Amino acid sequence: MIAVKPVFKRWAPEWLIRGTIFIVILPCLLLFGLSTANPNAAAGYYGIEPADVQYSMIIFYAAVASFFALERRFFVYLATKEYFLVGIILQIVTSYICYNTHNLHTLFIFRFIQGMANCGTTSICITLIFSRIQSERAREIGYSIFYGMLLCISPISMLLTAPIVDAYDYNFLYKAIIFCYLPGAILLLSIMNTVRLNRKIPLYQVDWASFVIYALVLCLIGYVLAYGQQYYWLQDKRIVRSCGAILVLLLLHILRQLNLKRPSQNMEVFKYRNYIVGVFLIFVLYIVRGALNITNLYFATVLGMDPIHIAYIMAANIVGIVISILISSRLLILKRPMRLIWIYGFGLLLIFHTWMIFLFNTQADASTFIIPLIVQGMGAGMLMTPVIVFAVSSVPERLGGTASAVGVFFRFLGFCSSIALINFYQLYNRTNHINRFQEHITSLNPVAVEKLEMYKRGLVGKGVSTGQAAKIAQGLLGRFIETQAQLRSAIDYYTVISGLLIVVILIIALIPYINRTIINLKSKQPAPISY
């Protein structure tokens, strides 16, 4: 009998294999978070708008989400080592181009290619990890750790990149990512054998048409949600045309999938009631999770913190995520009711948002926000794995790939919707508050007069002339109005999110059939793209 050649060389110990995979997957995940690391620095370096920075991140996400279904064909065609090498080379080359370019369209194109390569590399790493985990108990822990890492990416990106951006230009981050890839890639290639994890299937009848249509749909959805508020939504022809194209292409994509013999996305998943509940909760979770950016904006614009100090405070969020990973994985192993776990998670998020409504102020000590940020991390970590594994377990095993792909679509949609909502509250709601404040700033308003006099006295006391002090005082009053508008906008947004969380908790409590889904992960593994 012929011995099967192992994936890794026999001399490589298990701790080295797992450690190497972790070293490889970390820069893959960090690559997504580069755009969120310091949006102002990115906009300043490339000479673009903040919405362009957001869209560069959305394009990356759209690439990994759309390539997910097609990626499996390349995975089974190439040997694992060869496929990994192609993915790493593509990511290094595209990172180098992003490092050198100043052209926005070039950045968009290569961020998309980068996303496709990232999907392949992450897929290999996740497959290698879960191929070595056999028991269902270990897989549940593996799920929790993997999705916990994804939740930590944003604060970790801030923590790692803030000192670099402070010392170098923004584009240096892409050079740093290249050097992060090299050690793990070299080490993994040196301990791997040239083997296949699946039977080789030739690359014939690859459904490129579905990939192109689906990628266009995702990019257009991201475009509308990222730029919609800036262009006043349907008042702008670009948004109207994009919405029309989305409807046509989405209908074409659905009809195509319904008529294909082997569709990349089987619409049959929507026949399962609990799956619909699962993807709805994923969508809500990503909107709520994105609301943390309002807190980051508050730290930066109201409290005047620099990115380094914000990153240090956000480390508390990582602590909360780690704690909740341990708790949620334990609850999954013990087969606790899924409704109970969800209520715990959404309840913690509700506590965070209502707490922050009362903490938002023009002056605050950084230590005040540590416990709330831990609570937010615990809420997000408590939900991420249980919601996703519930959705995947709600459908038969043959639909597992489609369930993951459609789940990624709803994550993408929730992510983009969160950006759109925050843009609305930052551009429209905040402007309304500024206008309302300015209506009351007149010479007849005693509060405004008193505030101006206070600024003048303070400036004159520091040696500024009376005439100059009057001009500066007007500017300080304008800044005070903007700060108050930012606070009111943040409070309004968190009030809406709190209301949404209350509704979701009530829905979960009133749906009895949720607990009928049996969580079974023995034959499944997480989707490689779940940012």
Write out the residue ranges for each language-model feature.
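Extracytoplasmic
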Residues: 12-71, 106, 121-122, 292-296
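12-transmembrane solute porter fold
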Residues: 14-31, 35-37, 264-431
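Interfacial helix-cap and linker-helix signal at transmembrane-aqueous boundaries
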Residues: 42-47, 74-76, 129, 160-169, ...
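Helix-to-loop junctions at the C-terminal end of transmembrane segments
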Residues: 66-80, 165, 324-340
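Helix-loop-helix hairpins in multi-pass membrane proteins, especially solute transporters
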Residues: 70-209
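MFS-fold secondary transporters
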Residues: 94-99, 114, 188, 355-363, ...
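Hydrophobic transmembrane-helix bundles of small-molecule transporters
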Residues: 167-280
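Hydrophobic transmembrane architecture of multi-pass small-molecule transporters
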Residues: 415-513, 519-531
